[in-house]
Each structure stands twice: as C-alpha cells, then as structure tokens.
Amino acid sequence: MEKVLVFGHKNPDTDAICSAIAYAELKKELGMNAEPVRLGEISGETQFALDYFKVEGPRFVETVASEVDNVILVDHNERQQSANDIESVRVLEVIDHHRIANFETSDPIYYRCEPVGCTATILNKMYKENGITIRKEVAGLMLSAIISDSLLFKSPTCTEQDVAAARELAEIAGVDADKYGLEMLKAGADLSGKTMEQLISLDAKEFQMGNAKVEIAQVNAVDTNDVLVHQAELEKVISAVVEEKGLDLFLFVVTDILTNDSVGLAIGKAANVVEKAYNVSLENNTATLKGVVSRKKQIVPVLTEAFQA
C-alpha cells in the first residue's frame, strides 16, 4: 500500500507534532499506510510531552515528493508554512483550525477546518465518529496539544469544545490536566541553552498580509525579561532574517504565561504597522501588548487588517 505522510507546519509547535502523530494513528486504524513526520525541530515543550507519555517523535523531513505522491496536512494550510516542495505532491486532506489562505488544489479534497482552539480537539471528534478508541499515550499527546494552544485554557482561542475534549483526554491519559499542563508549559518556557537563532524560529510562521510579507514568532516565558535581556542579539539575528527573506515585518512576541500579557519586538520597514494596529508606541523597537497571548486570534487578524487599511 502506498505511503502517505502526515505533517504539521514548519517550526512545529506541540499541536503540529502531536496532531500529526494522532491523525496518522487514526488513519492507520482505518487502513491507510500513514506516517507522521515533522518539518522542523521539536520544542522543549513538545519534547516534555513526548517523554512524559513515552512516545517517539516523528522523523524530520524538508521535502516530501521524493518519498510520496500524497500527503495530509494538519494544523496548517498556507503553502509557505508547509513542506518546501508541497506543490509537487497531492494534498489528500487538511485538518486545521486556522484561517484559509494561499491554498488551492487541482482536485476535490477532504478539508476539515473548525473554529476551535486546537487541531487535536477536531481529531478527538474524528476518533469518536469512526468508532476508534484513543490509546492512552496518544490521548496524552492530544491533551498536550490542547493545553499548549490554549495556554492551559486561558487563551481567547479556547472554546468549550477544547475544554471538554481536554477533560476527556486527560481521563483516558490518566493525568490531572491542570497539574500536568502547568508542568508542560513551564518546560516550554525554559529557554535556557537556546541560541538566538533558535529562539526566533522555535514557533515562527510566515504570512502574506495584503502586499506585505510578515513573519511572526512567539515564545512563552515565566518572565519576559529573561528573553529581552538579549534584545540586542535578537535584533541582529532578526534583521538578518528580514533581509534574507525580504520581509516587511518580523514581529517577535514574548508571552508571559503567568500574567497573560506579551511584549512585541518589531523589526522591519513596516514596524510602524504594529503601532497602528495596537495603538501603542514602539520604544526601542518594543511595546507591551496587554492581554495578547494568541497569534491566531489577537495578532494575525489585527495586523492583517492594519496592513490592508
């Protein structure tokens, strides 16, 4: 049987990795030869979840067309966030919870996108719809994805469906969602030992906003100063990325997981758009973004609107 690769976006977060594993397992149960893979490094937070539930991480690939003809995308749809040669393969399915942009296919596909906080929440429904029991380890990874995307149910992207799914999955996994979740988020917020290049690419996504090319990277921290103490070095590596990719804006967002506020570091010729979008003034290229924790709901649409205004 021909193999199908299942993967999340570049610079994968916990949902991108764990949903690839969970959906590949569901597809295998339904008779498909599916393998989860990843398009980037595994973060400390994701590694904590994999280690905790004793699951091996997916192997790394940059291109897919040399291996397979067909792929399934989870947790993304935009071409620039996907495999480098995504145009050379057929996308069979997309399971996602983000905006739909820069995406088209030549054939009809199964496309499931729901306004929930996490791809794993959708997969929880799909396991039920297909009458497949979720293994304990996989339930733990799916729970981890929801906790990560919802910042332990505090993000404005978090819905009642996400909370309900997390409680169900926690029961299957045999963990206390709140206790485990805080441990996992703290593991993800431990940025010691990371290079500046790693910090700005741990969870980075590229977007087309009007005519502007924008990259938004986000890291969680227990104290934003632990990251911003390195601002001069961060600006140097961000400026190099801006030049290399021809970006109009690179916004590096440091989110405090205890206060649920963020600090944005804006570099690029369109940095002033951040000021316009949030009605703030950049001082030394940074501004506090009160109550902003979600890239999907509080950054991407706000900046997109500002660029198109």
From Swiss-Prot:
It catalyses: diphosphate + H2O = 2 phosphate + H(+). Mn(2+) 1 binds at residues 9, 13, 75. Signal peptide: none annotated. Its cofactor is Mn(2+). GO terms for molecular function: inorganic diphosphate phosphatase activity; manganese ion binding. The keyword Nucleotidyltransferase does not apply. SMART domains: DHHA2. Keywords: Cytoplasm, Hydrolase, Manganese, Metal-binding. Transmembrane segments: none annotated. Its EC number is 3.6.1.1. Binds 2 manganese ions per subunit. GO terms for cellular component: cytoplasm. Mn(2+) 2 binds at residues 15, 75, 97, 149. Gene3D superfamilies: DHHA2 domain (3.10.310.20), inorganic pyrophosphatase (n-terminal core) (3.90.1640.10). The keyword Magnesium does not apply. It is found in: Cytoplasm. NCBIfam families: PRK05427.1. Belongs to the PPase class C family. HAMAP family: PPase_C. This is Probable manganese-dependent inorganic pyrophosphatase.
